[in-house]
Amino acid sequence: MKKKELIWSDEFEGNTLNLKKWSCEIGNGKEGWGNWELQYYTNRTENIYIKDNILHIKAIKENYKYCKYTSARITTRHNFQFKYGTVEANISLPLNKGIWPAFWMLGNYSENWPNCGEIDILESKNLESKIYSYCHWYSNGVASYGKVSEFIDVTKFHIYKLDWDKEYIRIYIDDKLNYEIFIKDNFGNTNAFHSYFDLMFNVAVGGNFPGNDIDDSGLPKEMLVDYVRVYQNEGEKNYIINENIYNYNN
């Protein structure tokens, strides 16, 4: 087994989000970010903040701009992208009707969705205490393949891990395999998963996945992230940090 090295991480130290690592996506997006979500994403400390080395992403019931809810969505798109490796994050999720937290990845931004590829390390919804792990890509239309976990208490911290190489994408919960997909030689038109991806966290309110029947009495709700770390095989360096290309030839 090849030795792995840490290439990027955020331990969420300090008092504010590290904008050398993350960008906040703001607004309601086109057609509710393509999912008919109901929230307005902000960069306010009411919706995203760090306390005791924990990242908090909070969905709130409030009238803001033209929406009835606010939350936050962050991405490494402008700061860090990588191809292949291991991602680990220690996360606690909220449960509430109409809530949709996610830790996920998007691929090549020169392509529209689903051509760019999407890897959902975790999604959950409503009061379902289980994890949805999925991949989405283009194969004569939208192709989706995934798996739903057995019951786990998602409100407790669990380590969610992605292992990604030229042959497989595998997703683990506390080191137990939850999902895998074969991508070698672009099997099933999975060529999207051989490009560079970024990391994303968000908590949506409503939308196609959880539905729009929101339990306002249960809000606010928070996703908590203890850390996120990315490893690659020693010497590979298939990543981009702050637009500096370390290796773009594999």
Where are the predicted features?
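GH16 jelly-roll
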Residues: 1-250
